[in-house]
Amino acid sequence: MCMALQPEVSRWDVTPSEAVELQRRLREQLVLRPPPGLKVERIAGADISTEKGKDTGFGGFVVLDVETLAPVAQSEAVVTLHFPYVPGLLSFRELPTIAAAWERLTVRPDVVIFDGQGTAHPRRMGIACHGGLLFGVPSIGCAKSLLVGTHGPLGEARGSTAPLMHRGEVVGMAVRTRKGVQPVYVSPGHLMDLPTAVEWVLKVSPKYREPETTRHAHRLVNALRRADGEAAELE
C-alpha cells in the first residue's frame, strides 16, 4: 500500500465556487523547488479515463524505472465521479479517482508526472499542483494543450523550449519533445521547479511527443475502461 493522503487538501465535497477559493488557499502551500538532494529512481505517470455521458472514472498509476523506463509497479481504481467538468477545476473531478489508485500503489515514486497542468493555470493551481500536495510528492504537469498563456517562436529541434507567459509571469514552458511535432506544455506542480520539470519530461520522452509515464498510464486506464464496458455487456 502506498502512503496516506494529506487530509487538508483532500476536500472534494465542495461547489465550484468553493473549489476556486480552496485552490487559492492551497496555492499558498506549494513549494516550487525540489527537495534538497532529490534522488530520482522511480518516476510515475497518473491518468484517468472517462466515458462521455457517464459518471465513472477509471484511474491509474504506472511507476517506471528512470534508467530503463520499464514499468516496475502499477495500480488502478474505478470511482464514481461527483464533481462536474469545469475548466480550471479538473483536480476536483479527477483526483478522487487518482487518489484511490495512489492508495493501492505498492511502490512509492520519487516524482509523478500528471497529464495536465501544474502552475500553467489561472490560479497557478492545476491538477499537478493539487496532486503533489495531496500525495506529498514532487510533481510535474505535462499537458497536450494550453489552458492559459502564450509563448513565442519555438525551434523545430527536439529539446527546443519557449517560456509560457501569462499575466506577465512565466508559468510554464512549451517543450518540443520530438522534432517537427507539436510541443507539450510543462509546468511545476509541487516540490518542483520549472527547469527540473523540463529536464525530467525530456528524459522520459525519448521517442514520442508524450512522456513514457503518460503513455503507460494512458494505456492502463483506457484498458480498464474498455474491460469494464465489456463486462457490462456480458451481464
UniProtKB/Swiss-Prot annotation:
It catalyses: Endonucleolytic cleavage at apurinic or apyrimidinic sites to products with a 5'-phosphate. It is found in: Cytoplasm. Its EC number is 3.1.21.7. Keywords: Cytoplasm, DNA damage, DNA repair, Endonuclease, Hydrolase, Magnesium, Metal-binding, Nuclease. Its cofactor is Mg(2+). GO terms for cellular component: cytoplasm. One of its GO terms (molecular function) is magnesium ion binding. Mg(2+) binds at D47, D115. One of its GO terms (biological process) is DNA repair. The record marks Y85 as: Interaction with target DNA. Belongs to the endonuclease V family. DNA repair enzyme involved in the repair of deaminated bases. Selectively cleaves double-stranded DNA at the second phosphodiester bond 3' to a deoxyinosine leaving behind the intact lesion on the nicked DNA. This is Endonuclease V. The lineage of its organism: Bacteria, Pseudomonadati, Myxococcota, Myxococcia, Myxococcales.
